[in-house]
Amino acid sequence: MDFFILEQRSREEFDMVNDILHHACTGAIIALLFSTPKKTWFYLLLGAAAALLPDVTKELFQDSLLHSLIAAPFAAALFAGILKTIFKKEPFMRIFGSFLAAFVFGHLLLDLIDNGNAIFYPFVKEELEYSIISKSTPLVWIIALAAISAGLAFKRIRLLSAAGILTILLYIGFQAAAKEMVTNALHERYTFPNAAITVFPTGEWPWEAMNWSYHA
């Protein structure tokens, strides 16, 4: 019994670390598209922080407001204004754009395609989801981290960040197509009228044999 408790705890800790890296690395690589050669680390850290912010406030205040698309531009404007007072020479719109992009694409939309998100809170309080990426997969942050590392090493940070983002988008597209194929196959197998079949990813890697599960 102790072994199973320890294993479950280890799994929960892995999932937590994986989730942090999932958002932080994605936010960082998105924000780096806005970077300049002298401000690479500024935008890298800004993007990581922006993408983690919704979960920080959720854990501290048990509130879903910053998981909403509606709150995103206001949060970005607030933090961009604060950062502008510190980094006076940096254009406000560049800070705002990088923060907003990392916030939305590095967290809100990632949540939407893995475990769901109340993306229209407070007008729609239910979590919406289109699960095509398993919460346990490290593939997204591995791609992002590899692209960032290569960009820093070869001093082509924006180019290789764009390449990393394109690779992630191709992976998401592959997962979306795979989900549709599995869903169509299940509808052909279960020919009940108006059958509601929900397909969701379970594997850590897209090449695993048991990568999808479902409930009807």
Give residue ranges: language-model regions:
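N-terminal membrane-targeting hydrophobic helices
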Residues: D2-V199
